[in-house]
C-alpha cells in the first residue's frame, strides 16, 4: 500500500518543528471538530504556529492558512519545492501575513515570513492529537465529541450501566449532565454511537 505523499511531507514538517523545540499536535480543529483543521499545530511555551500542508500551491491552501492567522502566533503553508516559484501566490501570502515554507531533500526554505498575531485565539488542544497522523487521508482527527464517546465506551466496557450514572462519572464536553444524556441518547438512537 502506497503511503500518502502529503502525510510524508507532513511528517518531515513535524520532525522539523520538533527539532526546533516545538511540541506538535496533528489535525487540530477549531470549534469542536469542524472543517477548519490545521495539519500541524506547534506549541513552544507561549508561542504557537499553525501549519497547512499540501503537495501544491492553490487558493484553497492560502484560504486555509488565512483562517488560522487569528488562532496562532504564526501561520505557515508547507509545500514541496518545485523548479519554478509561483511568485503571484507568494505575493498573496506576503500580503496576508501567511508564511511559506518549501521542502526538498531534507531542506526547508522559508520564502515568505509570516506576520505575528500577538494574542491569538488558540484552539483547544488534546493529548490524543500528539499521537495523530497529520494530513491523513482517512478523515481521522480528534474532536471533543469523539473523546467523550471514547470515555463513555471505556467506562462502560461490557457492563450494563445506567447512562445517567455513566455521564456523571466521565469527563465530557457538554454543558451539563442532562444535555450530555439527552444528546448521547439521540446519537445512540440514530446509530452514530454503536452499543453492544
Task: Pin down the residues of each PLM region.
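Non-catalytic C-terminal interaction segments of nucleic acid-processing enzymes
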Residues: 92-196
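Short, contiguous strand/loop micro-motifs
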Residues: 1, 51-52, 139
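A cross-family signal for key residues in well-ordered alpha-helices
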Residues: 11, 15, 69, 154
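Acidic-basic catalytic patches of nuclease active cores, encompassing PD-(D/E)XK
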Residues: 1-37, 41-45, 87, 94-109
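Conserved catalytic cores of phosphodiester-cleaving nucleases, focusing on short active-site segments
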Residues: 13, 40-57, 76
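Short, well-structured alpha-helical interface segments that form or flank functional binding sites
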Residues: 8, 35, 59-63, 70, ...
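Charged, low-complexity surface patches
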Residues: 2, 6, 57, 80-82, ...
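Catalytic cores of nucleic-acid endonucleases
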Residues: 55-105
Amino acid at each position: 500500500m502506497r503511503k500518502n505523499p502529503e502525510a510524508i511531507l507532513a511528517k518531515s514538517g513535524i520532525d522539523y518543528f520538533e527539532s526546533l523545540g516545538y511540541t506538535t499536535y496533528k489535525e487540530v480543529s477549531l470549534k469542536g471538530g469542524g472543517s477548519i483543521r490545521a495539519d500541524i499545530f506547534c506549541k513552544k511555551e507561549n508561542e504557537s504556529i499553525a501549519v497547512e500542508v499540501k503537495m501544491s500551491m492553490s487558493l484553497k491552501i492560502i484560504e486555509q492558512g488565512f483562517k488560522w492567522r487569528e488562532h496562532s502566533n504564526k501561520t505557515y503553508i508547507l509545500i514541496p519545492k518545485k523548479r519554478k516559484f509561483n511568485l503571484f501566490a507568494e505575493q498573496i501570502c506576503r500580503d496576508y501575513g501567511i508564511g511559506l515554507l518549501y521542502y526538498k531533500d531534507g531542506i526547508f526554505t522559508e520564502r515568505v515570513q509570516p506576520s505575528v498575531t500577538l494574542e491569538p485565539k488558540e484552539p483547544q488542544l488534546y493529548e490524543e492529537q500528539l499521537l495523530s497522523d497529520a494530513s491523513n487521508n482517512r478523515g481521522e482527527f480528534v474532536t471533543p465529541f469523539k473523546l467523550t464517546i471514547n470515555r463513555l465506551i471505556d467506562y462502560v466496557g461490557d457492563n450494563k450501566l445506567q447512562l445517567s450514572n455513566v455521564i456523571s462519572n466521565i469527563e465530557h464536553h457538554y454543558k451539563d449532565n442532562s444535555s450530555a444524556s439527552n444528546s448521547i441518547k439521540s446519537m445512540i438512537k440514530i446509530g452514530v454511537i454503536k452499543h453492544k
